[in-house]
Design a protein with these regions (language model features):
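Short strand-edge motifs at loop-to-beta-strand transitions and within beta-strands
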Residues: 22-26, 66-70, 236, 391
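Short, small/polar residue-rich loop motifs at catalytic or cofactor-binding pockets
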Residues: 41-44, 230-233, 386-388
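Short, surface-exposed beta-strand/strand-loop-strand elements in extracellular ectodomains
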Residues: 43-56
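Vicinal oxygen chelate
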Residues: 108-117, 159-180, 185-215, 234-239, ...
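Core segments of cupin and vicinal oxygen chelate
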Residues: 115-171, 210, 217, 227-230, ...
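Short, structured interface segments
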Residues: 175-178, 233-257
Length: 409
């Protein structure tokens, strides 16, 4: 059983100019039970907050600045209203948290999903990178149940392939899809590495400099030459023909130079988030119980290797599934500078670039029931057949998380 302190609302910052009364209202989901409203006050001395029609914060509660914690009782559907009189200028930050327990039964990461405009070109690209295993075609060109699970109103038309560093292919794969005809969406991948959502995946190599030279000679587009991060990691970013980013890092084990790429394994899948605490707790509930710090800042070569002229800074944590799983790792990053608050791709799941992540679960029926009971938003109906299926849920930033596994009665 995993326990997490979920953010049910916020964090939202409400600013008020002197003499300009402000009212804000919203709804949010939770479960029946106790919770906390966490308020950070910066200069506001006349505000009122109601949750489900009950006054929980009054002006006398704001006589001091800093953090204020108010106990709450929540229900599945909730309302919140924030009213600031405008007697003083300032801001308040509001977050509602709720301690929650669940067992979703995650077993491993199956793949990250990448959409391409040209399947033949993309297959050749992964061959150039040194991916040895491939399943193609890896699924039917049409499927109404799968299409609706991905957010389409009816059917789609696709090519799909699964790429693996090993042959015969093993997970985690790169699930590559070319949406065709009316289901194609002609929008480019995220242009910069700080965009909210899934911007890249990281592979380790035993010969970073050799791979860089080899791939550059093959015409692969790199952001820069290999660079060294403040934590000592040597890395480089490259792009596929659509502009989707991948990252290569030097593995601890160093091998002799080879005449072809020396990729070893998928190290992590990146997720840029708007609030690190909120995302960390969401994935803790899913089973990501192990963590390591990942905050970095720097300028010069380090920033340029990320595609930026000025200094960069992000807070982060690398999280992985616990004992009894394959140790899949997610790289959560909250960018401080440069900051980009544009939201991730909207449904359906057909935007060019990395647009989804898949996890296998022990019992899909039980996992869906638990996610629905906890109030998480489901993208569409269950795709697949009576014995095995898949479904998408949104994480706190709208990143599409796919759960797949056996279905029970």
């Amino acid at each position: 059983m995993n326990q997490a302190n979920l953010t049910r609302f916020g964090p939202r910052v409400f600013e008020c100019a002197q003499g300009a009364p402000t009212t804000f209202s919203a709804t949010f989901r939770a479960i029946d039970g106790t919770a906390k409203l966490v308020l950070q006050n910066s200069g506001i001395d006349d505000a009122r907050i109601e949750v489900n029609g009950h006054a929980v914060v009054a002006p006398q509660d704001l006589r001091t600045t800093g953090e204020i914690v108010v106990p709450l009782t929540l229900q599945p559907e909730n309302t919140i209203e924030v009213r600031m009189a405008g007697a003083s200028a300032g801001a308040i930050s509001v977050r509602v948290t709720q301690l929650t327990q669940a067992d979703l039964g995650l077993l491993r990461q199956g793949y990250f999903g990448l959409n391409t405009s040209d399947m033949a070109r993309q297959r050749a690209f992964y061959d150039t990178l040194g991916f040895k295993g491939e399943i193609y075609p890896a699924g039917p060109e049409t499927s109404t149940t799968f299409a609706r699970a991905l957010g389409f109103p009816d059917d789609y038309l696709i090519h799909v392939s699964l790429h693996s560093l090993e042959d015969p292919p093993v997970m985690p794969f790169v699930d590559t899809v070319q949406f065709r005809g009316d289901s194609y969406r002609d929008e480019p991948p995220y242009p910069d590495l700080n965009h909210i959502g899934m911007t890249y995946a990281t592979y380790s190599t035993t010969d970073l400099d050799g791979d860089f030279a080899y791939l550059q000679a093959k015409g692969v587009d790199f952001v820069s030459a290999p660079a060294t991060a403040p934590n000592g990691e040597r890395f480089v970013f490259l792009k596929d023909q659509d502009g989707t980013y991948l990252k290569l890092i030097q593995a601890v084990e160093v091998a002799a130079a080879t005449s072809s790429p020396s990729l070893v394994r998928l190290v992590n899948t990146n997720m840029n988030v708007t609030d690190l605490e909120r995302s960390r707790e969401f994935y803790r509930l899913l089973g990501f119980t192990e963590s390591a710090p990942g905050s970095l800042a720097g300028a010069g070569e380090f920033a340029a290797a990320h595609g930026f002229d000025g200094p960069i800074e992000f807070e982060g944590v690398d999280i992985s599934l616990g004992e009894g799983t394959d140790g899949a790792t997610l790289q959560l990053r909250q960018w401080k500078r440069p900051h980009d608050d544009a939201p991730p791709y909207s449904p359906p799941v057909n935007h060019l670039g990395i647009d989804r992540i898949n996890f296998y679960v022990k019992d899909l029926t039980a996992a869906i029931r638990t996610m629905n009971e906890l109030g998480f938003e489901q993208l569409g109906p269950i795709g697949g057949g009576p014995g095995f299926g898949l479904v998408f849920f949104f994480d706190p930033d709208g990143i599409k998380v796919q759960l797949a596994g056996p279905r029970t009665a």
